[in-house]
């Protein structure tokens, strides 16, 4: 076993060697390096063929028509294009958008920007399990609602929203439905022939593909119209201009093809690893699982260790890569906005750690990590006066601390 151990697969994944090989074939002078938009020679034709093959591979994982896949630079851009594209195109129909308080910042910050432009956004509060129910959405739907945007799997706590039921609701009311599937693609089955989802965002680097490439599914039946946010050249049917990065697209296609092939077996393996890890740490007192206990992906295990500061626990686990909060926001010392929205108090939110398991995680790594977590938590609690008080039966929440 090699140290350090990577248990932060929800932040990013390494590129699968099979993917890297396919990408390498598209870079050098004797490879497939042409511009896919060059229509006048074989270099361009070959590149375009590779791009269309990648488009087909992405579409096959989610059972969509390849013509419904638009290449972007990643899920953040896909979210921006979906929200701004719909808002600007359909604003004459209405200016009300619904999302939730625990979306990724790519959706929340875009929603805030749309508010500055005069749109009205309702931010739903999820249940304690991190799930937004169809009833919650129905309660705030209005005649001027044009879009509902909700994630499929939450990036911090791994809970799964019932997008099938929410899609039935939005479709029946004539409201467009966008789903951020960055954390669910390759982990949860997605069938866009059955799901009533109009727009769906994807990222390659969460599925063992390269960073810097993603896609947006844009439904053709019923047809969804978008106003572009990047102009110049009219690539991707005018929805997203810019020379297509053949090697990135080939990488994303191959990554999604591998995911389709291996998803069922891999999910079972990851669940066994996650259960094995949890069993070993579950003897710790005052341990809380964040998010849903049942509707969750096994890849993500978000735990709060009460009376332990999450940052100090991170420091103690120096040869284990895990995170507190999402990678995009974990630089700030604010407690996770996701956990606070789930009703966790600041202490528990501050003591949370996200463990995420993936394709290259081994049993040996999981055992080592679990042992180190138990050692670190016990050691930090020994140093904590709050832990002593808790053990002595003092209800810490009732104490009024004096300021000096």
From Swiss-Prot:
GO terms for biological process: [2Fe-2S] cluster assembly. The keyword Iron-sulfur applies. The active site is at 328 (cysteine persulfide intermediate). InterPro entries: Aminotrans_V_dom, Aminotrans_V_PyrdxlP_BS, Cys_deSase_IscS, Cysteine_dSase, PyrdxlP-dep_Trfase, PyrdxlP-dep_Trfase_major, PyrdxlP-dep_Trfase_small. The modification N6-(pyridoxal phosphate)lysine is found at residue 206. It catalyses: (sulfur carrier)-H + L-cysteine = (sulfur carrier)-SH + L-alanine. The keyword Cell inner membrane does not apply. Its cofactor is pyridoxal 5'-phosphate. GO terms for cellular component: L-cysteine desulfurase complex. Pathway: Cofactor biosynthesis; iron-sulfur cluster biosynthesis. GO terms for molecular function: 2 iron, 2 sulfur cluster binding; cysteine desulfurase activity; metal ion binding; pyridoxal phosphate binding. [2Fe-2S] cluster binds at residue 328. Keywords: 2Fe-2S, Cytoplasm, Iron, Iron-sulfur, Metal-binding, Pyridoxal phosphate, Transferase. It is an enzyme of class 2 (transferase). It is found in: Cytoplasm. Its EC number is 2.8.1.7. Its main location: cytoplasm. Pyridoxal 5'-phosphate binds at residues 75-76, 155, 183, 203-205, 243. PANTHER family: CYSTEINE DESULFURASE (PTHR11601:SF34), CYSTEINE DESULFURYLASE FAMILY MEMBER (PTHR11601). Homodimer. Forms a heterotetramer with IscU, interacts with other sulfur acceptors. Master enzyme that delivers sulfur to a number of partners involved in Fe-S cluster assembly, tRNA modification or cofactor biosynthesis. Catalyzes the removal of elemental sulfur atoms from cysteine to produce alanine. Functions as a sulfur delivery protein for Fe-S cluster synthesis onto IscU, an Fe-S scaffold assembly protein, as well as other S acceptor proteins. Belongs to the class-V pyridoxal-phosphate-dependent aminotransferase family. NifS/IscS subfamily. This is Cysteine desulfurase IscS.
